[in-house]
Amino acid sequence: MAIMSDLPRDLLAEILSRVPLASLRSVRFTCKKWNDLSKDRSFLKKQIVEAKKKQLKSKEFEVIMMRNFRVYLTSVDLHNDVNPSFTPKGTLTSFSDDANQHQVDNVSSVFHCDGLLLCITKDLNFRLVVWNPYFGQTRWIQPRNSYHIKDIYAIGYDENKNHKILRLKDQYYDYDSHPRARICEFELYSFESNSWKVVLDVSPDWYIHSYHRGLSVKGNTYWYATEKHGYVNFLICFDFTTEKFGPRLPLPFNATESFTYDDVVTLSSVGEEQLALLFQSDATLMMEIWVTSKVDPTEVLWNKLFLAVDHDMIEFDYELKFVADAGSFFIDQKKNVVVVFDKDMNEHTHRGMAYIVGKNGYFKRVDIGEEAYTSCFPLVCSYVPSSVQIRQLT
């Protein structure tokens, strides 16, 4: 009787192609032949294409969630109106620290680009790790000097698909000899060279709040930014090909008229090529969701309003006001709803909540579990798998 490892490569590839992409990591440990095939670039590309086709047909889709300082690849099903589900995928709920061989449960931020996740730890050293959850690959990245709690990060790639990480710090600090001293640092890490370099020609007249998370679309990262000496707000993009920031990009709403710092503005993506923006007014609690029709480092065009929600139309027992440094969201285009993640702070125990909001007053609140840490808000970002490999360092 033939055993699997003796089968011809073409037949073995056909069999393994039927294995769910998320299970490939377990397959690698079966034998060397399976391990080699599962890492073959053409095989992986085929797997990714099939996985995306299945996802389009399925009622479920996948997102990345961060809860209690852990990162989860999560399956979402919103088509059951009675009991929508957010289910962590068992083998991909966390990753191992290569140095210490234990699960990492101290992630403070996570960013997605091209199937890769950039995770920032909250330990004293603020370490960086890049993770491909499907392939179980990680790379821990050492700083050029040191990391800081106020650092802002982004992950992207240039026109040649070379992946890079941007670290920026633009803050004011009080020192005895130099009160309100400004520290402005911009650095780029290259996966190809495994090294950092300083970006020199940057002297911005704008700033980004440390709690405003960047969003990567088509390899470049976008932020909600504010003029340094005024109240003008806009988007700014870092182009990983030119390694420069682009011009100010327009918001879909009037960012100067009665705008306050308690208004909520947060970014998300739709698929791999569209930018989405959530705006909630602190004064009226009106929520608007906009989606781009065109997005690149020098130009952003906005489609018509995707969804506008008047708080008075929602049957809820208290004001639905998202926290300025939380309120992460994603759009389910099939169901035509927006799902916003936040924390219920009105109960004795803090609970992570998913608020499903649609047109004509459609609203549903889903309890996603207790939050053990008051300082950790549930974060979510869209996830699209890819065949990008994290080259292991020797």
From Swiss-Prot:
It comes from the Eukaryota. It holds the Pfam family F-box. It comes from Arabidopsis thaliana (Mouse-ear cress). This is F-box protein At2g17830. Residues 1-47 form the F-box domain. InterPro entries: F-box-assoc_dom_typ1, F-box-assoc_interact_dom, F-box-like_dom_sf, F-box_dom, Gal_Oxase/kelch_b-propeller, SCF_F-box_component.
